[in-house]
């Protein structure tokens, strides 16, 4: 399974297994990418990207951050972005993986005077399972994760549908996607809840409940040559009222963007048509 790197900085816009922003995979089909090298060969790429991350907390501006972009595949193991995984099943039509990754989330009261008196919420690590169904150029991906450090004691799950268009014999491609993200009441309450101790004038107590967020995105790539690739991703998400009604949240919609360049090391796949 070949994924573009994912990177998100807020759990409210994080794609489970995303993470963030996990770009659609390169699908098989009439304009399919060239065959991958044998699975026993190490395949990896490294690059640099820039992300623009919406931060919905009151008084906190969007953040633009440079990030390293890493992909590594060896046999059934892989690392991409902020996640690592193992393929239990990996066929042309189905994949079933165990996956672990960082949750780049959290609240820092120093980020805004309007958050004064809030207790810091920490990033965490999540683990879970991902099932992908890949009929032709389409992909239906379902994932479920739990916070294994117990910071939020919460879970999140997602279902995404995407379609890949490949052009000019794999020179460039586009993939739109739509999806939904469910987050448990514990997770929502941890990141946007307000405890009685955090109440201030204009900031009443708030207890978060489970939320269902909607998102849509567009991923694209352009291969400069067999080793250098440009990638881009833009994703919009609408937050559930269970999140946007929190007194420490002032945005119900957000946009995430990523642009980057990567260099592929090691063995190369055969050129298309060779």
Task: Locate each region found by the language model.
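Membrane-embedded beta-strands of outer-membrane beta-barrel proteins
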Residues: 46, 68, 129, 159-161, ...
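Short glycine/proline- and aromatic-enriched beta-strand/turn motifs that initiate or cap beta-hairpins
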Residues: 22-78, 266
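Transmembrane beta-barrel strands of outer-membrane/channel proteins
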Residues: 46-52, 83, 98-102, 129, ...
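Cleavable N-terminal export/targeting peptides
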Residues: 1-40, 266-274
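Outer-membrane beta-barrel transmembrane domain signature
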Residues: 87-88, 148-251, 265-267
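Repeated loop/turn-to-beta-strand initiation elements of outer-membrane beta-barrel proteins
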Residues: 44, 76-79, 94, 137-140, ...
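Outer-membrane beta-barrel "beta-signal"
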Residues: 67-71, 161, 252-274
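Residues that define the transmembrane beta-barrel architecture of outer-membrane proteins
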Residues: 42, 62-68, 92-94, 121-127, ...
């Amino acid at each position: 399974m070949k994924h573009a790197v994912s990177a998100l900085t807020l759990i409210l816009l994080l794609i489970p297994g995303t993470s963030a922003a996990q770009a659609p995979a390169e699908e098989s089909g009439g304009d399919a990418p060239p065959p991958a090298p044998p699975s026993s060969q190490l395949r990896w790429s490294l690059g640099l990207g820039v992300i623009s991350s919406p931060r919905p907390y009151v008084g906190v501006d969007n953040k633009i951050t440079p990030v390293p972009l890493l992909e590594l595949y060896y046999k059934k193991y892989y690392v991409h972005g902020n996640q690592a995984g193992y393929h239990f099943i990996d066929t042309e039509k189905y994949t079933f993986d165990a996956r672990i990754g960082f949750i780049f989330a959290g609240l820092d009261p120093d980020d805004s005077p309007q958050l004064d008196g809030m207790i810091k919420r920490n990033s965490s690590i999540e683990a879970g399972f991902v099932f992908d169904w890949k009929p032709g150029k389409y992909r239906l991906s379902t994932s479920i994760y739990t916070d294994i450090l117990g910071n939020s004691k919460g879970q999140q799950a997602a279902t995404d549908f995407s379609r890949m268009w490949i052009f000019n014999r794999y020179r460039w491609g586009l993939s739109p996607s739509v999806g939904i993200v469910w987050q448990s009441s514990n997770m929502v309450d941890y990141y946007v809840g307000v405890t009685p101790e955090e109440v201030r004038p204009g900031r009443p107590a708030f207890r978060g409940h489970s939320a269902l967020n909607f998102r849509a995105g567009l991923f694209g790539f352009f291969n400069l040559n067999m080793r250098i690739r440009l990638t881009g991703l833009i994703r919009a998400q609408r937050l559930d009222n269970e999140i946007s009604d929190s007194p420490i949240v002032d945005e119900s919609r957000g946009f995430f963007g990523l642009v980057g360049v990567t260099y592929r090391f090691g063995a190369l796949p055969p050129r298309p048509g060779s």
